[in-house]
Amino acid sequence: LTDHILNEISGLEEPTRNHQILASLPISTYWTTNYDNLIEKSLQKENKLADVKHRVPHLAQTKKRRSAIVYKMHGDISASDETIITKDEYESYPLKYAPFVTALSGDLISKTFLFLGFSFSDPNLDYILSRIRIHFSENQRQHYCLVKDIEKNKLTDDEYDYQKLKLNLMIKDLNRFHIKAVLIQDWKD
């Protein structure tokens, strides 16, 4: 099953314009839950050397002359047998991948994050953000996320109101973690 899912997303995609924009910025640390290698491809096109971390032992190693670190907390397409994809794997993540939890916690405490294309439904990130909120309360670092606003399009009034309510509740919830949502109308913006 894991191989089938990962084969569906493997290697066929090319980085988007947004990937290229991110790679061109002076960003030294990337965290992703994606298995693909689009960030790495984008960095390579910018002549930047990525130090990719997708296994626990990678965390203790440093690639010389690296331009950026890419943390792939749920694994990499190149090691499909080690990806985090099932509910059981998500549930055991804080124990089996504790060094990733520690590293991400440290970065969330000491660095400002910009979340892009993230649904905030990942239980591992929720676990980490919750622990930081409990420990640091109002002394958390401010983070940001880009969220696409709800479009009326073909939605009925009731559907639109429901989607808008869900979005507003998510934004309110993100505020608990000091994540400010910036609404955009179109991803091209």
What do these predicted regions represent?
Residues L1-V52, S80-I84:
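Metabolite-binding pocket within alpha/beta catalytic cores that recognizes anionic/polar moieties
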Residues L12-E13, V52-V56, P94-A98:
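Short gly/ser/thr-rich secondary-structure transition/capping motifs
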Residues E14-L25, K45-A50, L59-S67, S80, ...:
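SIR2/sirtuin-family catalytic core signature
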Residues T32, H74, V147-D149:
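Short beta-strand/turn micro-motifs composed of small residues
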Residues Y35, G75, F118:
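Active-site metal-binding loops of divalent metal-dependent hydrolases
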Residues V56, T86-K87:
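Aspartyl protease catalytic domain
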Residues K64, I69-T86:
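Class I SAM-dependent methyltransferase SAM-binding "motif I" and its flanking Rossmann-like core
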Residues K87-T102, I128:
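Active-site glycine-rich loop that binds ribose-phosphate moieties when present
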